[in-house]
Amino acid sequence: RDRVMDFAKLAEADSMLNTPNCFGIYVAGLTFKWIKAQGGVAALEARNIEKAKLLYDYLDESKLFTGTAQKRDRSRMNVTFVTGDAELDAKFVKEAAAQGLVNLKGHRIVGGMRASIYNAMPVEGVQKLVDFMKQFETEN
């Protein structure tokens, strides 16, 4: 058994083999408190399902934007999509940024767009993105 993981021996010796990552522990504590304040893990899961559904439902009906992941492989956190035209993708990213919708540019090799809708992203943020996508589609 690895000495670092033998907590009984460490406790008996009233010592540690290394100094714990204090800042990491502090940040983890803040994160756990935030999760609790949001209603817990189950509430975050429900919200993440709602956000992903909102965006994927729009992508599934859009005539301009197409999701790049197969339905069975879709991520709740990173939603990737394209217009099918690299110049139009670039225009979308630029105009979205002007509306405060930032960091939507996709991977430098794959291209397209990627909306990262992690836990801290509110449903309202995803709705703002979908509303902008609808407007962009109408205008293009």
Regions found by a protein language model. Name each.
Residues 28, 35-36, 80-82, 117:
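Short, well-ordered beta-strand elements within core beta-sheets of diverse protein domains
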Residues 18-21, 82, 119:
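Hydrophobic alpha-helical scaffolding
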Residues 65-96:
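Conserved PLP-binding catalytic core of the aspartate aminotransferase-like
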Residues 1-56, 70, 139-140:
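Active-site C-terminal subdomain of aminotransferase-like
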Residues 12, 75-79, 111-113:
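Short amphipathic alpha-helical segments
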Residues 64-68, 100-106:
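A short linear hydrophobic-aromatic micro-motif
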Residues 98, 110-140:
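PLP-dependent enzyme catalytic core of the Aspartate aminotransferase-like
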